[in-house]
Amino acid sequence: MGTATGAGYFQRGSLFWFTVITVSFGYYTWAVFWPQSIPYQSLGPLGPFTKYLVDHYHTFLRNGYWLAWLIHVGESLYALVLCKRKGITDVQAQLLWFLQTFLFGVASLSILIAYRSKRQKHN
C-alpha cells in the first residue's frame, strides 16, 4: 500500500523487519510478564541467557519494557509532526503513520524521514 507522493502518502514498512520486531517484542513481553512459562532449555543459547536476565535483572527488564513503549509513543507523535512538515495532510494517512510507528518504531519512522515531498524537492 502506498501513494508515491502527496497529501495521502503512506508506505508500509518491510515485512522482514516487522516480523523481526513482532517476534522480538513478543518474546520480550513473554519474559517480562510470564517468565515461569518459558521453556528455557528448548531455546538454545537464548534460553539460559533469558533465564539469567529474568532471575537477576527482572526489574530492569520490566522498566526497559515500559521505556520501549514510551519511546514508541514519542516516535509516533514525531511521525505526526513529520507528516505535517512533509505536507501529508490526509487524516487517514497520518493515522496509518502514527499506528505503524507506534507498533514498529524506527522501522516505520525511517521511511517517513526519508520521504521527500514535491514541495521539499523544489526547495
From Swiss-Prot:
The chain crosses the membrane at residues 15-35, 63-83, 95-115. InterPro entries: TMEM254 (IPR028110). Pfam families: TMEM254 (PF14934). It comes from the Eukaryota. Keywords: Membrane, Transmembrane, Transmembrane helix. It is found in: Membrane. It is a multi-pass membrane protein. GO terms for cellular component: membrane. This is Transmembrane protein 254.
